[in-house]
Amino acid sequence: MYKKFFDGVIEVITGPMFSGKSDELIKRIKILTYADIKTLVIKPSVDYRFSQCEIVSRSGLKIPTFLARTTQEIRDLFTRDNYQAIAIDEIQFFDEEIVTFLEQIADKGIRVIVSGLDQDFRRKPFGSLPNLMAIAENVTKLQAVCSLCKRAATTTARKVLNEAQTLIGDQDEYEARCRACHSL
């Protein structure tokens, strides 16, 4: 029933913006670091909000990271060293090829931990994350607080007029909403 720590596994951390996904990812990376498990940490190069060289959470936690634009760049970084784990923040910004790559390395005994949005601002599946959730051994779905009614928020609402699915932003562009308060 339980896997050994070094059995390959895929873990997904998801939820709306402002739910603590990066905090949870950094916490799990630090546990691996304490255990001397060599971990490749990645974030997409398009995520420039807080730092170009670190994953930074809104609570102030931070951890050094490599930047990548494509799955091929991640693959190249991964093969440069003898990594035992890989952690990727904002996974929804990578191409669909990432699902196959992460499944392949998990099958070889690598621990995979990813975080990101599973829904876009329209509450539609976002990027590769829903497909990763389908094959993951562990899915943690976090909640935020609805900016309007203060109930549990499970969605991210866009506050600015822009129809593009991807718009990098923060509190000026987005807020967490519950199902009842989320209007398109």
Swiss-Prot record:
PROSITE patterns: TK_CELLULAR_TYPE. Pfam families: TK. One of its GO terms (cellular component) is cytoplasm. ATP binds at residues 15-22, 89-92. Keywords: ATP-binding, Cytoplasm, DNA synthesis, Kinase, Metal-binding, Nucleotide-binding, Transferase, Zinc. The keyword Kinase applies. Its EC number is 2.7.1.21. It is found in: Cytoplasm. Zn(2+) binds at residues 146, 149, 178, 181. The active site is at 90 (proton acceptor). One of its GO terms (molecular function) is ATP binding. GO terms for biological process: DNA biosynthetic process; thymidine metabolic process. It catalyses: thymidine + ATP = dTMP + ADP + H(+). The keyword Cytoplasm applies. Belongs to the thymidine kinase family. Homotetramer. This is Thymidine kinase.
